[in-house]
Amino acid sequence: MKLLLAVLALISAGPAAADCPKAADWARAFYSEHYFFYGGAPDPILQFTTPEFGALLKKEWAYSKGEAGHMDYDPWLGAQDGEIGKPVRFSVETESPDMAVVSMLYPYVLDPKRPPERHTAHLVLRKREHECWHLHDFITPLGESLSYVYSAAQP
């Protein structure tokens, strides 16, 4: 009987874990599908964030009222101007069962006539038991943590 219960527990838990994308794949999809997560109303994005980071996005949205808030640049770029060139590479820097740091390395193009600079942004992901990855923090190419910036006292 105990063996049967153990097998049933593995079967019921197995598909949920198997259905979760790998951390780098999750980060790539988040980048592609939710690039402006930092600038719009937070409600549509909350399902992809931890409750803690979601609360900070809500706080920042309330503070900024749809205008520039604590960030005066695109956090993916680490700049106001320019664009992300190709190729964009996602790789896991550290990973444990409940946390991962994924780096996004890309050529930053400010002026097409000049060689691009290498920029790296980091997505800090968390996973709770029986859940998939969620964004817990975002570190800009400048090294600024959105969690830290968004939790700053309002001026």
Give the predicted meaning of each segment.
Residues 32-66:
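Short, solvent-exposed secondary-structure junction/capping segments
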Residues 6-10:
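Hydrophobic helical h-region of N-terminal Sec-dependent signal peptides
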Residues 12-15:
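N-terminal signal peptide c-region/cleavage motif recognized by signal peptidases
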Residues 1-4:
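Positively charged n-region of N-terminal signal peptides that target proteins for export
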Residues 54-114:
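Surface-exposed, charged secondary-structure patches
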Residues 89-92, 120-127:
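Hydrophobic/aromatic beta-strand elements that line small-molecule binding cavities or substrate pockets
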Residues 20-38:
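Short, aromatic-enriched amphipathic alpha-helices that serve as compact interaction elements
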Residues 99, 105-120, 128-129, 134-155:
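Low-complexity, intrinsically disordered terminal/linker segments enriched in charged
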